[in-house]
A protein has these predicted regions:
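Phosphate-group recognition and catalysis centered on beta-loop-alpha active-site segments
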Residues: 1-218
Length: 218
């Protein structure tokens, strides 16, 4: 059966990337997708944007971040144990704005979190390549522009375990030639597109509304 990924959980119902949002989504999907960053005090935080109120997440301590969010408990955003999430996870590792030492710390802190059925991905292809031998789970790269298809194709040939998280419009490119059984398409919120991508044989589809889209899976 093709897989449904809940994009940041159920973001239209709950705070995106919150533990509550992720666990609620798992009622409807096979995986939840969530973003992971690192704080100034080296905690893993489930947070999409690189900044908060014009300061980088990497420059803020956990307490400073929580003080700027309304009524958010620490355990909703700080990932300290894999047991917080009750199903399979696609962890997207966010490294934009980080220097290499921080990137290494972020990936190293993720290693004991990962479960064998998880997928760890990033726009930082180099770090995925550098750490892939240490991952206890599947891994992949994210691409959102056509020029990236050429290098991704080469990687797909040389690494038969690599997954590809592909922005949906790239499937219309004449240069798209990635293995569909290792391709996950984002972000799909229209019924016809959802059904089409699953029918064409993609491994999975990422959606903001898994509570709706699961109805259309055959």
């Amino acid at each position: 059966m093709k897989k449904i990924f809940g994009h940041r959980g159920l973001p239209l119902t709950y705070m995106e990337n919150s533990i509550t949002s992720l666990n609620a989504a798992l009622e409807y999907c096979d995986y939840v997708e969530t973003d992971v960053r690192i704080t100034a005090d080296n905690n893993l935080i489930l947070f999409h944007d690189p900044d908060l109120n014009e300061r980088f997440i990497k420059e803020l301590t956990t307490e400073e971040i929580l003080s700027q969010l309304d009524n958010v408990e620490k355990d909703e955003l700080i990932l300290s144990s894999r047991d917080q999430i009750k199903g399979k996870v696609n962890f997207e590792i966010k490294t934009d704005s980080l220097l290499q030492p921080q990137i290494d710390i972020l990936f190293q802190k993720m290693l004991p979190i990962l479960h064998p059925e998880d997928i760890v991905t990033s726009f930082n292809w180099k770090s995925i390549q550098d750490f892939k031998e240490l991952f206890s789970c599947r891994y992949g790269i994210i691409l959102d522009h056509e020029d990236a298809l050429f290098e991704a194709k080469s990687l797909s040939i040389h690494d038969e375990d690599m997954f590809f998280m592909v922005e949906r419009t790239l499937l219309d490119s004449r240069h798209f030639d990635l293995p569909l059984n290792r391709t996950v398409i984002w972000t799909v919120n229209e019924k016809n597109d959802f059904v089409h991508f699953l029918d064409m044989g993609a491994f999975g589809v990422i959606t903001d509304i898994p509570d709706t889209m699961h109805i259309y899976r055959k």
